[in-house]
């Protein structure tokens, strides 16, 4: 840091000042609040009955069987042959207020979006359509919809994030097949775990050779997600609580 670093429009001449600024930024609220809690969604069984997919008797039989199997209701109905995968997925999408996809062309998740693989895996959102001009991305996600993950991605990237529900097997294959688009503005770095004390080191690295850095952060999964951007590169840093062990290669459970 012989020449200092410009972070979010301000100049910091020393490592100590940069560290203090990064910590102060993390202490600020991570964007707009989630807003008031929505009304509880209709239960899946009620929706399937309303859509005339199952009868009341079939629902009761599935609930009775569920007590022994421990399966989710949708999985139980499919196992009993009472509802198709698409019927269950459609009802789950209505329940969440989003669209759904019964299948996904794997070519759409390769080289389409610049998000790093580790960020995608940790958030559990698989990009399959990206418009850099409209700053809009479509992502595949499984039920139940994790709105906190969607908000975190939107806050980190400043993109409009449109979630689409898919079945668990479709999501798993899409996740393992995802490859990022190589950005013309520089490499998309995989997410890196760090403590709050180490964050300034990452800021200094992204700012190498005098490149100004923009820092944004979002709270998700009991951690703070930080995106550092310069004209040189983009880096995602997950600031974990003290004592937390870094594990960034496992997909988020849904």
Q: Language-model segments: what does each one mean?
A:
Residues 80-156, 192-226, 231-233:
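Polyanionic, low-complexity intrinsically disordered segments
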């Amino acid at each position: 840091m012989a020449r200092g670093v410009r972070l979010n429009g301000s100049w910091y001449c020393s490592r100590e000042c940069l560290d203090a600024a990064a910590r102060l930024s993390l202490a600020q609220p991570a964007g707009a609040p989630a807003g008031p809690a929505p009304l509880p969604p209709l239960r899946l069984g009620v929706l399937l009955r309303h859509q005339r997919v199952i009868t009341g008797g079939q629902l009761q039989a599935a609930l009775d069987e569920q007590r022994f199997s421990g399966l989710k209701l949708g999985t139980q109905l499919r196992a009993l042959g009472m509802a198709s995968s698409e019927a269950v997925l459609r009802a789950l999408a209505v329940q969440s207020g989003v669209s759904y996809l019964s299948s996904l062309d794997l070519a759409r998740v390769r080289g389409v979006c610049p998000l790093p693989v580790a960020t995608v895996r940790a958030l559990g959102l698989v990009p399959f359509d990206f418009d850099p001009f409209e700053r809009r991305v479509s992502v595949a996600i499984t039920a139940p919809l994790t709105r906190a993950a969607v908000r975190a991605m939107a806050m980190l990237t400043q993109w409009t994030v449109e979630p689409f529900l898919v079945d668990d097997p479709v999501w798993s294959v899409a996740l393992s097949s995802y490859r990022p688009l190589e950005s013309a503005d520089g490499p998309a770095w995989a997410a890196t775990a760090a403590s709050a004390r180490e964050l300034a080191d990452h800021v200094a690295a992204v700012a190498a050779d005098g490149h100004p850095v923009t820092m944004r952060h979002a709270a998700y999964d009991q951690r703070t997600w930080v995106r550092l951007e310069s004209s040189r590169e983009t880096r995602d840093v997950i600031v974990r609580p003290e004592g937390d062990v870094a594990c960034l290669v496992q997909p988020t459970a849904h």
